[in-house]
Amino acid sequence: MRGHLRRRLWTVPLCASAVALTAAVGPITSSSADTITTTACNNRTNDTVAKLVECIRTDDLWNQMKAQQAIADAHPDAGGHASRNSGEPGYKAAVDLAVKLFKASGYHVTVQTYTFPYFAFFGLPGGSEVSPTPTTFTLGTDLNAFNSVGTVTAEVQPVGGIILPPTPTPSSSSGCSPADFAGFTPGNIALIQRGTCNFGEKAKNAVAAGAAGVLIFNEGQPGRTGLAGGGGMIDSAGNSVVPNIPVGFVPFAEGEHLNNAANAGQHPQVKLDFKAEADPNRDDFNVIADSPFGDPNHTVVVDAHYDAIFGAGMLDNASGSVTLMDIAQKLAKVRTKNRLRYILFGGEELGLLGSDYYTHNLSPTELAQIGYDLDADVTATQNYTIGVLDPAAKNLFGGPIPVFPANVYEPSKFARDEAVKYYDSIGLNHEFFSPQGTDAFWFNMVGVPASGILTGQDCCKTQEQVNLFGGQTGNFEGNLGTTDGGCVDQPFRWCDNLSNNDPNVLTFETKAFAKMVFKMAFDTTILTRTPQQAVAARTAAEQQKAARMAGASHAPMS
């Protein structure tokens, strides 16, 4: 699940792998033995919800999870880590497997290709202060790396606009103007204070001035002293910036120290070593599988994102993808009233790229045909919560609640309430969450009602959630009992592997999602729109997107 700008403000772990722990929460609803065989399920038509749910088998789900892990293991990234990341061989191999599965089940399959700016580090970025105080920077404590490539050892030269001591409120515009680089010596490392403009704008100006590297340091006010930054950068126009020189971020104390050393004539030197691969036009893929049954003018999209980030991505989101594919197999023979369209999206971890591309490249008629979206995003969390998607619910990332077209709110309750009824029937509580950070977001934005499921990731499970769902406070997954952030989406941990999932949670979550899918496959109240209404909603979404990008150029990435 994507959060913020895919949580590109990095924190880096003290260890490189998760500790395998027994799940803190015992499932309430799944029996230890399945009551029907895979063969029996595949040979019959599961044309009632009871038949479908009966055929959701732990063994089937877990075997598919093992297959996804095997793909990741067989296709490591350039650093040797198991990978299903977009733009890498592991993801393409996973796409090929999904295509084979859908075709074998009788679906009409299309692989939709789009391009995106690919970036990946080889191993761990590093750096050190060579002089006047030799110090090796610890990644995640002393240094964060922006998406940039290069190795340099050079003198550090402060640029214009640095304000020390800092003013009570942020005011530094260091590096925001080419004029700040007047007199800069090409080949030096530019020392720039955080503030006013985007990190990417500062980096662009440094590159234009001939810098061989960049160190941006925190500005120094309360709350702006420690480590920040890292990950992707954008310029003032909202364009991605990936310099061919290393660009790092250091805490205020290190920046102030280097600035003072330079002003004292000590000629401080720093080494930065960021090995990476960048490709501005890497192919990525969405897998689209249409049922041969059902009314195409009343299409229900069932989606999950298929890509990973920083590794195998088994909880986020092989689990949701397996939930989707298992249901697709079990429903393949059913003559549904509405057409089911299963989509495995790429690029979700990088900013909902696949669903953005898909929803914005449908013809007006195609967009108007889609009456509903169901999203499965993280369905096997060990220390779980039970989340049900509702566009009116809270933003899990703490930001403002998105405003969607008015027509999505009431219909989104159709499937939402079906999930709630199921959880109530098996004695599980639930909580509602906004689609922000999921692929359902773009469907809601273009006026398509949506719901879905989520079981939690990263950190931190609250005491209130423990009271609802059991388990323990702290990480939802990964190193349980701690607050280190877990495995999902965490840079340089590579620990979101098969062991980071609970097969029993995966089973009862897939059953819940199966009931939602079956409900919408036969629902007669799905809202329909004219092509003109659909395009109007999409145009409004594009305008909101442009406004967000314009706003982002002023504060969030600086």
Give residue ranges: language-model regions.
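Secretory targeting and sorting signals
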Residues: 2-33
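Noncatalytic luminal/extracellular "stalk/propeptide" segments of secretory-pathway proteins
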Residues: 33, 47, 66, 70-187
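Catalytic-core environment of secreted peptidases
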Residues: 58-80, 86, 98-105, 193, ...
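Extracellular/luminal Protease-associated
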Residues: 86-88, 137-251, 429-430
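Short helix-loop-beta-strand segments that form the rim/entrance of peptidase-like active sites
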Residues: 104, 240, 330-353, 376, ...
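Soluble metallo-hydrolase cores and metallopeptidase-like ectodomains found primarily
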Residues: 145-175, 237-315, 326-329, 337
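Metal-dependent peptidase/peptidase-like ectodomains
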Residues: 296, 335-336, 345-462
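His/Asp/Glu-rich mid-to-C-terminal helical/loop segments that flank catalytic regions of hydrolases
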Residues: 460-538
